[in-house]
Swiss-Prot record:
Source organism, top-level taxon: Bacteria
One Pfam assignment: Ribosomal_L29
Name this protein carries in UniProt: Large ribosomal subunit protein uL29
Gene Ontology MF terms in the entry: structural constituent of ribosome
UniProt-listed InterPro entries: Ribosomal_protein_uL29, Ribosomal_uL29, Ribosomal_uL29_CS, Ribosomal_uL29_sf
Length: 63
């Protein structure tokens, strides 16, 4: 996910995307805790995607 793509979305779309990413992060954390997660790098990728969405939301709030 690229920040430029996120900047083209509306605030409502970004909030929906953030909610989906947070749910995905929760599910991945549960899989990691139970030892079912094979691709541990996905946790890092989702965490960074969440940060990107939050950054763009902050930019839009300030503008």
């Amino acid at each position: 996910m690229k920040a430029q793509d996120l900047r083209e979305k509306s605030v409502e779309e970004l909030n929906a995307e953030l909610l989906n990413l947070l749910r995905e992060q929760f599910n991945l954390r549960m899989q990691a805790a139970t030892g079912q997660l094979q691709q541990t790098h996905t946790l890092k990728a989702v965490r960074r995607d969440i940060a990107r969405v939050k950054t763009v939301l902050t930019e839009k709030a300030g503008a």
